[in-house]
């Protein structure tokens, strides 16, 4: 699941 990817994208 790449659902957390959006979180990382916004985090960086």
Swiss-Prot record:
Q: Name one GO cellular component term.
A: acrosomal membrane
Q: How does it sit in the membrane?
A: Peripheral membrane protein
Q: Where in the cell is it found?
A: Membrane; Secreted; Cytoplasmic vesicle, Secretory vesicle, Acrosome membrane
Superkingdom of source: Eukaryota
Question: Which GO terms fall under biological process for this protein?
Answer: angiogenesis; cell adhesion; single fertilization
UniProt protein name: Lactadherin
Instruction: Report which gene this protein is encoded by.
Output: MFGE8
Species the sequence originates in: Capra hircus (Goat)
The entry's keywords: Angiogenesis, Cell adhesion, Cytoplasmic vesicle, Fertilization, Membrane, Secreted
């Amino acid at each position: 699941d790449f659902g957390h990817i959006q979180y990382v994208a916004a985090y960086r």
